[in-house]
């Protein structure tokens, strides 16, 4: 079985490590430029593939079938080659994000949610929150005339905040996309960044005693779902949590080993 990850810059990826815990199959990284995508997808070089930025929308026209979730969100992160050689596209980020909210105990039903950023991950977050019955879901973006970072204070009554922007990861370590202190009734903060494991936004949440979660659980949960699609086998519902804990321990060991003294 030949699986792997398709993207443009993949040196930082934890995906091969995660998939090594999910099955005995190859999972190489495929770094491709935009002009190489068509030839890569149409060649018979893989049985299944995960897709990351910037190609989650690019691959859609090459799919002969799309899951309902992929159609609803408008992006594909999991591709499987069907017996007739054509490609099926799904979006397991939806499952991963939903799993992350559930495990963190973030119940968005009838609550107000703001989502920072308007990229592909933002679409997934919005879709899941609406499906879970959120009362209001507002996307905050720099280019929006109505809901942007300059007037974000009008949403200071938000119950949950979800960051889907890269602010907080390299080279923006130590930066937060918002001032969390204005959100007096915030019940939870989710940051889809997982490296560093605690962004400035999450450190601020910790300081304010607001429950918070990073994106590692989502990453592991979507990988478990993708592996189920690839291999046609079901994993235990706690598999993603077990893998998340294992990776967290490894990341902690790396930090400790790198400390001076």
List each language-model region with its residue ranges.
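NAD(P)-binding Rossmann-fold cofactor-contacting core
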Residues: 132-148
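Phosphate/diphosphate ligand-binding glycine-rich loop within oxidoreductases
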Residues: 2-104, 196-198, 204, 208, ...
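Walker A (P-loop) phosphate-binding loop of P-loop NTPases
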Residues: 261
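Rossmann-like adenosine-cofactor binding region
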Residues: 147-212
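Glycine-rich adenosine-cofactor-binding loop
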Residues: 7, 91-94, 101-102, 110-130, ...
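Extreme N-terminal starter segment of soluble prokaryotic enzymes
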Residues: 1-4, 251-253
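Adenosine-phosphate binding glycine-rich loop
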Residues: 192-252, 256
């Amino acid at each position: 079985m030949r699986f792997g990850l398709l993207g443009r810059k993949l040196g930082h990826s934890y995906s091969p490590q995660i998939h090594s815990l999910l099955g005995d199959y190859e999972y190489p990284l495929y770094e491709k430029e935009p002009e190489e995508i068509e030839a890569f997808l149409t060649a018979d070089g893989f049985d299944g593939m995960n897709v990351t930025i910037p190609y989650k929308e690019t691959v859609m026209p090459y799919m002969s079938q799309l899951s309902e979730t992929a159609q609803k969100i408008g992006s594909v992160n999991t591709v499987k080659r069907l017996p007739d050689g054509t490609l099926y596209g799904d979006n397991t980020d939806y499952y991963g994000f939903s799993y992350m909210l559930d495990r963190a105990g973030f119940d968005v039903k009838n609550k107000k949610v703001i989502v920072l950023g308007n990229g592909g991950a933002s679409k997934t977050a919005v879709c899941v929150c609406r499906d879970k019955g959120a009362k209001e879901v507002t996307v905050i973006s720099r280019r929006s005339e109505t809901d942007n970072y300059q007037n974000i204070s009008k949403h200071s009554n938000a119950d949950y905040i979800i960051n889907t922007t890269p602010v907080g990861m390299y080279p923006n370590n130590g930066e937060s996309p918002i001032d969390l202190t204005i959100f007096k009734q915030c019940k939870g903060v989710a940051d889809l960044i997982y490296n560093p494991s605690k962004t400035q936004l999450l450190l601020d949440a910790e300081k304010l005693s607001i429950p918070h979660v990073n994106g590692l659980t989502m990453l592991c949960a979507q990988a478990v779902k993708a592996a189920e699609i690839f291999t046609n086998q079901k994993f235990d519902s706690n598999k993603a949590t077990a893998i998340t804990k294992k990776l967290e321990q490894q990341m902690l060991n790396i930090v400790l080993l790198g400390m001076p003294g």
